[in-house]
């Protein structure tokens, strides 16, 4: 095990088999094999490809940044803090069981693929920024956006969500600050917060497509088409689709 209140910088590759605890900032310039958990009081930055090995992995810190691909072996991944995934459209997250992020999330990966659930945020004030056109996929498991979902500032990025026979749940506003591009859901939709920009009540996305059922517990405002292939249920107050 490694512990201490100082920063720890590794120039090269890391094969971690013992826990790192209570380090300040932690960074690895090369590839990382995470066979143990990492806890920092500050940031964690993994510049090269990250591989998860062994059991469930927990990364705890202020902000955990992976700047390349992340590959699991069916382990669950828990990030306690903020998360930044990838820094290029070729980056991916694959092979993870469940993915749970308790803070803000920025996604710069082409895909995030898990066999189990994906949960982004722990409160409706958390933010999820879609930094590039991305596809989030599960194996018949739910994707939950607890926090606000926006595109990167100045961009209109598409968000594709594939959950099989499960559902996508939005608990906070979508596109309230920076509208998304096309939102495409293969699976069901459980909408508990508005899709609309706060300023001027403009569209919160370019379009919305849902392949199965939709529970509309909030209004939807898109600049283009809305397609609901399955049964639609209106819940709560009166609903406006525009």
Placement of each model-derived feature along the sequence:
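Extracellular lectin-like interaction modules
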Residues: 1-242
């Amino acid at each position: 095990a490694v512990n201490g209140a100082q920063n720890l910088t590794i120039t090269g590759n890391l094969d971690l088999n013992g826990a790192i605890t209570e380090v300040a900032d932690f960074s690895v310039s090369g590839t990382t094999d995470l066979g143990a958990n990492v806890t920092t009081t500050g940031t964690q930055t993994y510049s090269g490809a990250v591989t998860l090995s062994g059991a469930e992995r927990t990364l705890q810190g202020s902000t955990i940044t992976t700047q390349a691909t992340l590959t699991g072996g069916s382990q669950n991944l828990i990030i306690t803090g903020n998360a930044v995934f990838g820094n290029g459209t070729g980056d991916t997250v694959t092979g993870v069981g469940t993915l749970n992020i308790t803070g803000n999330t920025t996604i710069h990966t082409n895909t995030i693929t898990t066999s189990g659930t994906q949960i982004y945020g722990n409160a409706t004030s958390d933010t999820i920024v879609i930094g590039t056109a991305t596809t989030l996929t599960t194996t018949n498991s739910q994707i939950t956006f607890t926090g606000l979902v926006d595109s990167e500032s100045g961009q209109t990025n598409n968000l594709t969500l594939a959950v099989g026979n499960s559902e996508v749940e939005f608990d906070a506003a979508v596109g309230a600050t920076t509208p998304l591009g096309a939102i495409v859901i293969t699976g069901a939709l459980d909408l508990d917060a508005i899709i609309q920009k706060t300023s001027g009540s403009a569209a919160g996305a370019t379009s919305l497509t849902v392949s199965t059922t939709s529970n509309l517990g909030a209004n939807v405002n898109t600049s283009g088409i809305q397609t609901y292939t399955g049964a639609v249920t209106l819940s709560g107050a009166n609903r406006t689709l525009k």
